[in-house]
Each structure stands twice: as C-alpha cells, then as structure tokens.
Amino acid sequence: MLAAFVTIKVKPGSEADFEKTAKELVAKVQASEPGCKLYELSRSDQPHTYHFMERYVDQDAVATHRATEHYKSLGRQMGQYMDGAPVIIRLTEV
C-alpha cells in the first residue's frame, strides 16, 4: 500500500469555496477509483489549513488517480483558493 498525507493552506475567506470543491473531488474519487482505499479531507486545528489522507493499493492506482478528469479539473479549481503549494508526504506501508 502507498499513502500520502497532504497539507493545504487556503487563503483566508476562501474556506467554504475550497471545502465545496474538495468535497466534490472526494466524492468522485470514492465513487470511481477502486484502487484508492482512502481519500479523506479533514480540517486542521490550525487556521486555514486542511489535510488530505490518501491510500492506494499500488503505484498504478496512484497513476490512475492523477490521470482522472475529476482530479485534473477539480484540482485546478482548488488551486485558486490555495495559499501556496501543498506539502505532500508520501508513505509506503511496511
């Protein structure tokens, strides 16, 4: 299994718009990507900060995820609300 822990900071005042778009992405991933075993959005206790927790069966599932139209289009939409680049920690199960 492969996993990612992604931290995203959003511009103040854009939280609701970011959440709406991110929740749409979560729903589409969960409904259509069998190789993705976990795709979850959480709000941090830090202001304007969110985390995605992702878990995939293998590298092919990660590649499939990144190639989907919903990832590309909704990812672009989320970008307008972000305050800087996301911080991505990639993990491999031992």
Model-derived features: positions:
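Glycine-rich beta-strand-turn "strand-cap" elements at beta-sheet edges
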Residues: 2, 40-48, 75-94
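Short, well-ordered beta-strand segments in beta-rich or mixed alpha/beta enzyme
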Residues: 2-9, 38-66
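N-terminal first-folded block
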Residues: 2-32
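Short alpha-helical
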Residues: 13, 47, 69, 73
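An amphipathic, aromatic/His-enriched active-site/gating alpha helix that lines ligand/cofactor pockets
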Residues: 24, 28-36, 55-89
